[in-house]
């Protein structure tokens, strides 16, 4: 989010992770120190990756991600099973369908997609319930879900008490970067970081 980076670059170091679906994975090391806090912003599967791979953090802003949404309900598990089966036959078809349901235009990347990593990630979504990890960390967390999300439907979410529900779909932070930045800045202000 370039807009956000312009707002906070003088106070925060911004580090970007890439899970490697369309290019080489990039997981920079995060150093924990007394004088630096680690706040994370995730989207979709990035939330699951974070819960599995980052031991602690000082704050988390999560757009459209869930630790257990995909593993708990049988109809959703069946849908992921279909995606896995179809992905083996025609990855572009599945990705095009996913992006369409996310409200984002799919553009086949110039480089080769990492099909194995994409399939492995679908298995993680289907098979792993990460809620035990999710609640170990008592750091402030803001979950943002979207009213028109066709990937993670609001009606199927279990816990919405402290979560923020906004207008938009699964592609919200990409399609509305200014609104996403406002949510992030507000979270940082509420937690005395700005």
Where are these regions (language model features)?
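Short, surface-exposed "cap/lid" segments of acyl-processing enzymes
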Residues: 1-27
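Hydrophobic/aromatic beta-strand patches that form the interior of the parallel beta-sheet core
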Residues: 15, 39, 59-63, 142-144, ...
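Flexible "cap/lid" loop of the alpha/beta hydrolase fold
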Residues: 55-87, 117-126
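Conserved alpha/beta-hydrolase catalytic His-Asp/Glu region
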Residues: 89-129
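Short beta-strand/loop motif that positions the catalytic acidic residue
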Residues: 137, 143-145, 149
């Amino acid at each position: 989010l370039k807009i956000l980076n312009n707002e906070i670059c003088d106070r925060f170091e911004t580090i970007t992770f890439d899970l490697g679906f369309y290019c080489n994975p990039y997981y920079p090391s995060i150093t924990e120190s007394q004088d630096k806090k680690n706040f994370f912003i995730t989207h979709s599967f990035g939330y699951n990756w974070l819960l599995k791979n980052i031991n602690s953090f000082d704050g988390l802003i999560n757009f459209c991600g869930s630790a257990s949404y995909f593993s708990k309900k049988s109809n959703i598990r069946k849908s992921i099973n279909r995606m896995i089966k179809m992905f083996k036959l025609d990855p572009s078809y599945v990705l095009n369908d996913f992006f369409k349901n996310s409200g984002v235009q799919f553009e086949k990347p110039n480089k080769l997609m990492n099909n194995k990593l994409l399939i492995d990630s679908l298995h993680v979504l289907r098979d792993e319930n990460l809620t035990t990890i999710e609640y170990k960390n008592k750091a402030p967390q803001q979950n943002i879900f979207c009213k028109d999300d066709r990937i993670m439907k609001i009606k199927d979410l279990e816990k919405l008490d402290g979560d923020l529900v906004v207008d938009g779909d699964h592609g919200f932070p990409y399609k509305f970067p200014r609104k996403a930045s406002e949510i992030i800045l507000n979270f940082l202000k509420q937690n005395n970081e700005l």
